[in-house]
Swiss-Prot record:
Organism, as annotated: Pseudomonas putida (Arthrobacter siderocapsulatus)
Note accompanying the cofactor annotation: Binds 1 FMN per subunit.
Recorded family membership: Belongs to the SsuE family.
Keyword vocabulary terms for this entry: Flavoprotein, FMN, NAD, NADP, Oxidoreductase
The protein's name: Quinone reductase
Length: 186
């Protein structure tokens, strides 16, 4: 039997029916049997504060860090806010990286998908997330890049992914499966 890798999916939008959450669900459905994708919620994470860390870390921080630690890989799916990372996602990245020297992210293979209603597909957010991933020692898949624009047209009225977008997302998640296998073997 082949290895099944657990993938923590971190969605940078808090809206229940956001385009990013829909794309994350679609990727989960398209994932090959070697990947088990699970969305890790970030909406309940208090803002990171080192003073709070020193006194008593909130249970939500502990839960989040443990979910990331238990995963074999991480997939970020994010919108773009003001040409950068949404605050909730940056906070989750910070929470997972602390306390210093105990990052839950370290060494986990990763990829970034940005989804936007606009034409450039969240390019700014995608690259801002990647900057943090370099510092966090996360090997990030470089190709194919996933800047998905025109998010409103990706799904039909029933919420099903359209046939035009499916092949790209399928190729992306298949390549990510290979990336995870390659980098978890190191």
């Amino acid at each position: 039997m082949s290895q099944v890798y657990s993938v923590a999916v971190v969605v940078g939008s808090l809206r229940k029916e956001s385009y990013n959450r829909k794309v994350a669900r679609a990727l989960s459905e398209l994932a090959p049997s070697s990947l088990a994708l699970k969305i890790v919620e970030i909406g309940d994470l208090p803002l990171y504060n080192e003073d709070v860390e020193a006194e008593a870390p909130p249970e939500a921080w502990k839960r989040f860090r443990e979910e990331i630690r238990r995963s074999d890989a991480v997939l970020f799916v994010t919108p773009e806010h003001n040409r950068s990372v949404p605050g909730c996602l940056k906070n989750a990245i910070d929470v997972g990286s602390r306390p210093y020297g105990q990052s839950a992210w370290s060494g986990k293979p990763t990829a970034v998908v940005s989804v936007s209603p606009g034409a450039i597909g969240g390019f700014g957010a995608n690259h801002a997330v990647r900057q943090s991933l370099v510092f966090l020692d996360m090997p990030c898949m470089q190709m194919p890049e996933a800047y998905i624009g025109g998010a409103a047209s990706l799904f039909d009225d029933s919420g099903k992914l359209n046939d035009k977008t499916r092949p790209f997302l399928q190729a992306f998640v298949d390549k990510f499966a290979s990336w995870v296998k390659l980098n978890r073997a190191v």
